[in-house]
Amino acid sequence: ADIVEDVRFLPNPYYIEEYRHKSGRVPCVRDYVESFPITQTYKEKWFDMIDFLLPNYEREGKSQLVIAVGCTGGMHRSVCMAEAMYKHLRDNGVDVSIEHRDIQKNDVEEDAPGYEGEA
């Protein structure tokens, strides 16, 4: 990865029993993570940083930028934030793809398609 983000400082849905076995793509889990002011502040600053970096990487000839997002289990917070960045970049005309490397390594009982499934 070119950029690595650690989102373990965000509130963890794992400790909410009804969210424990749902991924960060499930709307109620996403809404929980996004309901905290710290999440909104982080997203604003993170999006601004990536928006600043993209044209600078392109100017240096970099045709691809890999952003890794991690948390404790790779199921809730990192998934939610990776999805948010995916949507932000896509909505701003960036050719973007997303992969959740660790989501199925967990005891996921409920998942959702995420933003990549949207047209």
Would you name each region that the model predicts?
Residues 1-65, 90, 104-107, 111-119:
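C-terminal accessory "lid"/substrate-recognition subdomains
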Residues 94-105:
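Short beta-strand-centered segment that lines the nucleotide-binding/catalytic pocket of NTP-utilizing
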Residues 63-86:
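Catalytic cysteine-centered active loop of the rhodanese-like fold, especially the PTP/DSP P-loop
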Residues 86-96:
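Post-Walker A helix-loop "phosphate-sensing" segment adjacent to the P-loop in P-loop NTPases
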